[in-house]
Regions:
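Metal-dependent nuclease catalytic cores that hydrolyze phosphodiester bonds in DNA/RNA
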Residues: 1-132, 137-155
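Alpha-helix initiation and capping sites
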Residues: 87, 162-165, 206
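Conserved alpha C helix of the protein kinase catalytic core
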Residues: 89, 167-170
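Amphipathic coiled-coil/heptad-repeat helices and related helical stalk/stem segments
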Residues: 119, 164-167
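Metal-dependent nuclease catalytic regions and adjoining charged, substrate-binding loops involved
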Residues: 145, 158-160, 170-208
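A short acidic, glycine-rich active-site loop
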Residues: 151-165
Length: 208
């Protein structure tokens, strides 16, 4: 599957670079709406009370406690732009994949998972071929060393300081589906890579 996603994306972008393309107006409208939603959300001061979210689970407990206690409000001045980059990369990825003929079965959907007496919410990125995939923007170093030829699932698992694996399995469990892995765009070069999760996932699902 990873080769199919990458093959279709690379083939489409290569064709566009040589010949151009007439995009589906519906996809252009969806992209515009996603960008607008990101700008409004990131600039808004109405972020509500802290609640545990799938995107924060798997990270160090001390960091989660700081966020709960309000430390997340002390963002550095460039944080907003960094968050917007992530949102826009997701919107670009979805536009390109749909235009390349990849069947996206679900996208940017709110999900909730019951964990004991508590529930945790989140927003999954995409479902493709019956699996949940996470879209990431990455620095050149992370692109190569974490998700690319020099990295991979096993290397991410060895030092998963951001909780990517736990988050992926929580999203997938909320949909009762397997976790596909990560679709990653190098934010410096625009290159793509698909980093797949293993087919046998039961052990990692339990750990998540």
């Amino acid at each position: 599957m990873n080769n199919l996603i990458l093959h279709k994306v690379q083939g489409f972008l290569d064709r566009v670079s040589r010949e151009g393309a007439d995009l589906d107006p519906k996809l252009v409208k969806e992209f515009t709406e996603a960008c607008t939603k990101s700008v409004v959300r990131q600039f808004s001061n109405n972020r509500g009370d802290w609640r545990p979210r799938m995107s924060s689970l798997g990270r160090p407990l001390c960091q989660q406690k700081m966020e709960r206690d309000g430390a997340e409000k002390n963002f550095e001045y460039n944080s907003l732009v960094r968050f917007m980059f992530g949102d826009l990369v997701e919107a670009i990825a979805i536009l390109v994949m749909k235009s390349a003929g990849i069947d996206i079965e679900a996208e940017q959907e709110s999900v909730k998972l019951q964990l004991g007496k508590n529930s945790v919410s989140g927003t999954l990125d995409v479902e493709i071929d019956g699996k949940v995939w996470d879209i990431k923007s990455a620095s050149p170093y992370a692109f190569e060393q974490k998700f690319g030829d020099m990295g991979g699932y096993k290397k991410i698992k060895q030092d998963d300081v951001f909780g990517y694996i736990s988050q992926g399995y929580l999203y997938s469990k909320s949909r009762d589906k397997d976790f596909g892995g990560w679709i990653v765009i190098n934010k410096a070069s625009g290159e793509w890579v698909v980093c797949e999760a293993p087919e046998l996932q039961e052990e990692d699902k339990k750990e998540a």
